[in-house]
């Protein structure tokens, strides 16, 4: 159960961290679902065509970054509405994934790719009864997600570049006046976020499936957007948020196998209901550290500085 929960939460972890990087520079990207779908479809296609898991992941990340580049150009350079642009990006990503998915609908993930997602055991720790096999025997993608979340935390909170990012998210005008290249940092973080979203989508399509399945993300991108708030824009808390949602989803699958008189549709709703309850709880606790970047969702007009 724990092993499944961690694996289920991993693609969401990638998307949450990607979303945090984007929102930290003041851009609310509701296109996470679209970027995940683009990464999922292109990653699956490249995996089938080459049998190389590394190329598949790089292609998936590039697809997510391409979607993020479109978003960045419209919202940073053209100063378009961030909410509308994000929604359009999700619709666009859904269409792209449907197109690519149609081309590879008869293909299967090669064994060379599937074998890359075999569990990697941590010496000694993986031998701990029950907990060891569930937690310390995971595939390389799970460990990569954890490493990226930790690196993102140190990048945002312990480096000069991270200080620039946080300054831009709070007050881009003041950051610009102090000599920080606001546009450059916005582009970099939005593209990095898109790359991570693409990786999350590819994990869903290549590690969990053998054949293509339309709408493979099943709303994971939207959940990630909500869990960004749950994690209070902290990549370390994102680990807990993602795995908690993974546990709720895993519990849903497990309970459906029990002989209890609860509609399966209600069980499917449980993770989403829990997410809403948590968001309400966080909204009621008006703590300073729980607040989003002050410039989140606002276009920056340098001439009005």
Model region roles, listed by residue range:
Residues 1-15, 28, 42, 50-55:
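Membrane-interfacial amphipathic/re-entrant helices at transmembrane-helix boundaries
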Residues 170, 176-177, 181-184, 255-305:
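Cytosolic-side transmembrane-helix boundaries in multi-pass membrane proteins
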Residues 134-212, 235, 240:
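Helix-loop-helix "hairpin" substructures at the membrane interface of multi-pass membrane proteins
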Residues 2-5, 34, 54-62, 84-87, ...:
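Hydrophobic alpha-helical transmembrane segments
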